Curated annotation (Swiss-Prot):
Pfam families in the cross-refs: PolyA_pol, PolyA_pol_RNAbd, tRNA_NucTran2_2
Family per similarity comment: Belongs to the tRNA nucleotidyltransferase/poly(A) polymerase family. Bacterial CCA-adding enzyme type 3 subfamily.
Enzyme's top EC category: transferase
Role played: Catalyzes the addition and repair of the essential 3'-terminal CCA sequence in tRNAs without using a nucleic acid template. Adds these three nucleotides in the order of C, C, and A to the tRNA nucleotide-73, using CTP and ATP as substrates and producing inorganic pyrophosphate. tRNA 3'-terminal CCA addition is required both for tRNA processing and repair. Also involved in tRNA surveillance by mediating tandem CCA addition to generate a CCACCA at the 3' terminus of unstable tRNAs. While stable tRNAs receive only 3'-terminal CCA, unstable tRNAs are marked with CCACCA and rapidly degraded.
Native species: Staphylococcus saprophyticus subsp. saprophyticus (strain ATCC 15305 / DSM 20229 / NCIMB 8711 / NCTC 7292 / S-41)
Gene: cca
Disulfide bonds: none
EC annotation from Swiss-Prot or TrEMBL: 2.7.7.72
CC cofactor: Mg(2+)
Domain of life: Bacteria
Reactions the enzyme catalyzes: a tRNA precursor + 2 CTP + ATP = a tRNA with a 3' CCA end + 3 diphosphate; a tRNA with a 3' CCA end + 2 CTP + ATP = a tRNA with a 3' CCACCA end + 3 diphosphate
Binding residues annotated for ATP, in chain numbering: G28, R31, R112, D155, R158, R161, R164
Protein name: CCA-adding enzyme
Length: 399
């Protein structure tokens, strides 16, 4: 069975082979192909060194030359081509002290994390599976390549990656792999938080997140991770896939007495803003008890975010985060109110701060922001029409 992404990348392998180098597809793309899952990225491994790769191809980018990786540009697409390599000792549970380029496929794949990721495939779709990765896929088993204690001692991130794969695929952890994860979990404290968060983002969004999250709790993994170590994760249950930012917001909302710094997660400013918005939304959702309060709530937070939070209502209740009044706040009422709102943002108001300053004949100050907010709410609640002459009259009676 062919695959369009592999077919598109075939000329890369053909050109390397034409120059007498070995070349194979490897890793996640081969695994996903064998599992009939969508393939997103193609990784190519070769006996050619970085210098030789650059000699073979006209357009290249040396994105990871020291690790043997060169980006090859072909027909507008970029392909990661990595030299067969072996690794020296690991001193910090994160990265090898040395990388050695080798000429043998077996030497390359034996350094990989899990058997299902150590499968290579040639240009004719012939499989090279030295560690029974296909059997483990068939039996839905996550097993390390070789000794699991050695694999996790080399790079503790493999523990989180293994649990991420469990969340995505629903596979079981092979017994020795499970035991080694438990034995080495404390080593994740040596990892950069950014690397951990990359895996956690995929983990919380997995279809089988419950199984994986329970293992994280069993391993007491969170006590070794910045930000999360301040929370009592045993109190939190995660049964359904959700974005990482939503998970963090729910955890903060559940344990508001904890004063942890979101900045410790090293996520983007947009993600931090998203978390804070969701926390504020959850804080206020219980206060919505009337139709007029619902109007203001929908105006402030928007239909999209409110409906997202409501889609996790079971998780919110299971974790005792909220006691929403379902008769007032539900998908139908939120959608209806959103349709009826006279405006969606302050930019649509038919009056602005300059107008109000002229009416009041006062200097600007905190009062102006408060007045603009009052005008907003008056429009949303239907107290006044969003029409400048009417708004001016309304403001005159209040400043």
């Amino acid at each position: 069975m062919t695959n369009s992404l592999f077919e598109t990348a075939k000329p890369i392998l053909e050109k390397l082979q034409a120059h007498h180098f070995q070349a194979y597809f490897v890793g996640g793309s081969v695994r996903d192909y064998l599992m009939n899952r969508p393939i997103h990225d193609i990784d190519i491994t070769t006996s050619a060194t970085p210098d030789e790769i650059e000699t073979v191809f006209d357009k290249t980018i040396p994105i990871g030359r020291e690790h043997g990786t060169i980006n090859v540009i072909y027909k507008g697409e970029q392909y990661e081509v990595t030299t067969f390599r072996s690794e020296g000792d690991y001193d910090d549970h994160r990265r090898p002290n040395e990388v050695f380029f080798v000429r043998n496929l077996y030497d390359d794949v034996q350094r990989r994390d899990f058997t299902m990721n150590a499968i290579a495939m040639d240009i004719n779709y012939q499989i090279f599976d030295y560690f029974e990765g296909q059997q483990d896929i068939k039996h839905q088993l996550i097993r390390t390549v070789g000794n699991p204690d050695e694999r996790f001692d080399e790079d503790a991130l493999r523990i989180i990656r293994g649990l991420r794969f469990q969340s995505q695929f629903g596979f079981h952890l092979e017994e020795a792999t499970f035991t080694a994860m438990l034995n080495h979990i404390a080593d994740i404290k040596y990892l950069a938080i950014e690397r951990i968060v990359v895996e956690l983002k995929k983990l919380t969004n997995g279809d089988f997140v419950s199984k994986s999250f329970n293992n994280l709790k069993h391993f007491m993994a969170f006590k070794y991770i910045p930000f999360f170590k301040h929370y009592d994760i045993t109190k939190f249950t995660l049964r359904n896939a959700m974005p990482f930012t939503t998970f963090v917001a729910f955890l903060i909302s559940q344990q508001r007495e904890i004063d942890a710094n979101i900045a410790d997660l090293k996520v983007s400013n947009n993600e931090k803003k998203r978390i804070k918005t969701l926390v504020q939304l959850i804080d206020q959702i219980d206060e919505v008890q009337t139709k007029s309060q619902l109007k203001l709530f929908v105006y402030d937070y928007g239909k999209k975010d409110i409906l997202e939070v409501l889609s996790y209502l079971d998780e919110l209740k299971r974790n005792r985060i909220t006691s929403i009044s379902p008769l007032i706040v539900n998908d139908q009422t939120v959608t209806e109110v959103a349709k009826q709102l006279p405006m969606l943002s302050r930019s649509e108001m038919d009056i602005n701060g300059k107008d109000i300053l002229e009416i009041a004949n006062k200097k600007s100050g905190p009062w102006l922001k408060e007045t603009l907010r009052e005008v907003e709410y008056a429009i949303i609640s239907g107290e006044v029409v969003n029409f400048k002459p009417e708004l001016k009259k309304w403001v005159k009676t209040r400043v």
